[in-house]
Curated annotation (Swiss-Prot):
CDD domains: AmyAc_Glg_BE, E_set_GBE_prok_N. Catalyzes the formation of the alpha-1,6-glucosidic linkages in glycogen by scission of a 1,4-alpha-linked oligosaccharide from growing alpha-1,4-glucan chains and the subsequent attachment of the oligosaccharide to the alpha-1,6 position. It comes from Parasynechococcus marenigrum (strain WH8102). Disulfide bonds: none annotated. Coiled coil: none annotated. Monomer. This is 1,4-alpha-glucan branching enzyme GlgB. GO terms for cellular component: cytosol. The lineage of its organism: Bacteria, Bacillati, Cyanobacteriota, Cyanophyceae, Synechococcales.
């Protein structure tokens, strides 16, 4: 190639760099072989002079072809072992040359697995990584944007000018650039120029930390600095079957549990202050608690209540508080509202130290249209479908992932592995599964597209969920994967190997709606709706169900749980206690939303906090004590949880006394053969001498009574227990003559020791009677 041609080529490359239109800067920058040896070219926009520093020598670089492309010739290849001294705007500094580092970061196998959708640790390649190259510290940036014309790094390091740090395009639509000297905490974004010339500034899809809203830049964060202390917890978790354990979950939203005063400083773990994060404009003077403050206050509270797990509404980064976290933009980062990723790790570590598992809400069903997020990422519908009939939730104003694209599926599946591996979470609850499974979800006729078979099922979403759950349990066998699925889609909790979706628990939405419909009725009318409280048993063994009274039931005009109840205040409290006790004794794992544990009155408000002052009133304190005791009873009695998903674990005694709105049943445990008798009266009318058949004669201790004075009840009961009579009822030869308090639930346990004493006393009495007869 002639000199004029080379000159013309260099001028064109310089202009492409200056206009952010170059996709292969390594083709001309860095050390390049030349006729005279090696030509080193550096790209320094708006620099006045550049000097090469190498091997103790200095060489002033010239710009013969473009004013910002500086070069000099050496007799040898300097590799990456050189620096440049740059004078720009009267300021001089020295730096390593980003384009001296030519080796690819993403290897062939990485690209292959990613293109297949099977790279379970793709986050170890994608994103911004603090690393060393050739012994030099810096940050390696890696991005997937296959349709972009060019991609640049923006940040404080270049005054947010995309001309300074163009990235190199590799195979498979991958873009890379190593920036030496860049440190942890640096802000950055990607500037993506599309094929039609538009320019977008995007946060890193794989960013490990982001700014506090309303700012939305990504933050360079370290992944490997935290020292965990939960090894024994993790070992126990992964070697046990969670379905055979008691699971009682406290669902909560970190930002509205309780607030601190904005006057109270936010102290970081190193003791330095940090600017507080305001709770909301509508609550001036309040700030959000930090992860550290939540660990100090929330964890002891949850432990005292006796819950086994905390479920966090989405803590992935999101721009809008009002979305409750369900419109995610930062999939690989805990929200910075409450602190740093390591501070969230410390929160989880503390939970495990106190015996509490951590479940997070995971939202793979949709994402928002925010300009800095995934939408139209590289100038094409990269993460979403282009056709709005399958790519948009119009009612929610969000976009739907394109599950048929391998790299998109990989982004989500690896994200699941990331949260379990990096943050030691114990489970996920997958939000809005029904919206993923059906193409016509919330869509009128004509606004949805049938699948390849002409049906409404989203086969790509089904395959994605199966893959996600398969990979999850492959890596973390003791994990929880909970589906919020509101339809009758079959085999949600069956293994993927036999065609199931692969979850191990499913929220029982039918139970929830039936219970709330029933308890909202005036008690007199409940006799006509007995089916509401008994129907769930007919299908409870078709899936592994979790009973949930969730956040969705205490917003948007639905009232909080206490205020759903009919009657005067006394009846509202009693109904609430009875419902919670029925939930804890019914087959299935348990979840309640924050505030229900003490009878919150007001609807949940994401910008407020809970009505903690209500605990100054005895009835509310009574509900809290009831929940404490329910959790204690639940964990102490394997009959209430061991056989949740085996029909042996439940047996009706009587479900047909609709006239009195009374039900009775047994919870049984197969390995020990123990059982509990549960009797519930769902009217304000108490009953004396109410007969309940039992399978074995003897003494039955009353171990729980929702009407106890301790809980704010009328303190009716059975004096601690009752012996059986030889009175046949409900198919049993023996029965209990019980007092049923109003709006109550009672639990009885057969006491072998006292039964033996009672039997002995009965035998003596019988012998005395026979002696008296002979006289």
């Amino acid at each position: 190639m002639g000199g004029a041609a080379v000159l013309d080529w260099m001028v064109q490359d310089g202009e492409r760099l200056a206009n952010c239109r170059h996709d292969h800067p390594l083709a001309i920058l860095g050390p390049q072989p030349s006729d005279a040896g090696w030509t080193v070219r550096v790209w320094m926009p708006e620099a006045h002079s550049v000097t090469l520093l190498e091997g103790g020598r200095e060489a002033l670089m010239t710009a013969p072809n473009h004013p910002w492309v500086f070069e000099t010739t050496l007799s040898h290849d300097p590799g990456s072992n050189y620096k440049v001294r740059v004078e720009r705007g009267g300021i001089t500094h020295e730096q390593h040359d980003p384009w001296a580092f030519r080796d690819e970061w993403m290897g062939d196998m990485d690209r292959h697995l990613f293109a297949q959708g099977n790279h379970h640790h793709i986050w170890q390649r994608m994103g911004a990584h603090l690393t060393q190259r050739d012994g030099i510290s810096g940050v390696m940036f890696c991005l997937w944007a296959p349709h972009a014309l060019s991609v640049s790094i923006l940040g404080d390091l270049n005054s947010w000018d995309g001309r300074h740090h163009p990235m190199q395009q590799r195979l498979g639509g991958i873009w890379e650039l190593f920036i030496p000297g860049l440190a942890e905490g640096s802000l950055y974004k990607y500037e993506i120029r599309t094929q039609d010339g538009h320019c977008y500034q995007k946060a890193d899809p794989y960013g490990f930390q982001h700014e506090v809203r309303p700012d939305n830049s990504s933050v360079v964060a370290r992944l490997d600095g935290f020292q965990w202390s939960d090894g024994s917890w993790m070992q126990r978790r992964d070697s046990s079957n969670p379905l055979e354990q008691p699971i009682s979950v406290y669902e909560m939203h970190l930002g509205s549990w309780i607030h601190a005063s904005a006057e109270e400083p936010w102290i970081q773990p190193d003791g330095s202050p940090r600017a507080p994060v305001p709770a909301a404009d509508m609550k001036p003077g309040a700030r959000l608690l930090t992860y550290a403050e939540l660990a100090a206050r929330l964890i002891p509270y949850v432990k005292e209540r006796g819950f086994t797990h905390i479920e966090l509404m989405p803590i992935t980064e999101h721009p809008f508080d009002g979305s409750w976290g369900y419109q995610v933009t930062g999939w690989y980062a805990p929200t910075s509202r409450y602190g740093t990723p390591d501070e969230f790790r410390a929160f989880v570590d503390r939970c495990h130290a106190e015996g509490i598992g951590v479940i997070i809400d995971w939202v793979p069903g949709h994402f928002p249209k925010d300009a800095h997020g995934l939408a139209f990422f590289d100038g094409t519908h990269l993460y979403e479908h282009g056709d709005p009939r399958i790519g948009e939730h119009k009612e929610w104003g969000t976009l739907i992932f394109n599950y048929s694209r391998n790299e998109v599926r990989n982004f989500l599946v690896a994200n699941l592995v990331f949260w379990f591996e990096q943050f030691h979470i114990d489970g996920i609850r997958v939000d809005a599964v029904a919206s993923m499974l059906y193409r016509d979800y919330l869509r009128p006729d004509g606004e949805w597209l049938a699948n390849e078979h002409g049906g409404r099922e989203n086969t790509e979403a089904v395959q994605f969920l199966q893959q996600a759950n398969h990979v999850l349990f492959q890596h973390f066998p003791g994990a929880l994967s909970i589906a919020e699925e509101s339809t009758t889609w079959p085999m949600v909790t069956q293994p993927t190997e036999i065609g199931g979706l692969g979850f191990n628990l499913k929220w029982n939405m039918g139970w929830m709606h039936d219970m709330l419909d029933y308890f909202e009725l005036d008690p007199w009318f409940r006799q006509f709706h007995q089916n509401n409280i008994t129907f769930s048993i007919w299908y409870t063994y078709t899936e592994n169900f979790m009973l949930a009274l969730s956040h969705d039931e205490v917003v948007h005009g639905k009232s909080h749980l206490l205020h759903k109840m009919p009657g005067d205040d006394w009846q509202k409290y009693a109904n609430t206690r009875a419902l919670l006790a029925y939930m804890w004794t019914h087959p299935g794992k348990k979840t309640i939303f924050m505030g229900m544990e003490f009878g919150q009155r007001a609807e949940w408000n994401v910008w407020g906090d809970l009505q903690w002052d209500l605990l100054n009133y005895e009835p509310h304190k009574g509900i809290q004590l009831l929940v404490d005791d329910l959790n204690t009873l639940y964990k102490a009695e394997p009959a209430l949880w061991r056989d949740d998903f085996d029909q042996f674990g439940f047996q009706w005694i009587d479900c047909n006394d609709n006239r009195h709105s009374v039900i009775s049943f047994m919870r049984r445990e197969s390995s020990s053969g123990t059982w509990l008798v549960v009797v519930a009266n769902f009217t304000p009318q108490s009953h004396s001498h109410y007969r309940v058949g039992v399978p074995l004669a003897g003494f039955y201790e009353e171990i729980f009574n929702t009407d106890a004075a301790r809980y704010g009840g009328s303190n009716l009961g059975n004096m601690g227990g009752k012996p059986t009579d030889e009175w046949s009822i409900h198919g049993y030869e023996n029965s209990l003559d019980l007092c049923l308090p109003p709006l109550s639930l009672l639990v009885f346990r057969h006491d072998p020791k006292r039964s033996l004493q009672a039997a002995s006393a009965s035998a003596c009495d019988k012998a005395d009677d026979e002696t008296a007869d002979t006289n």
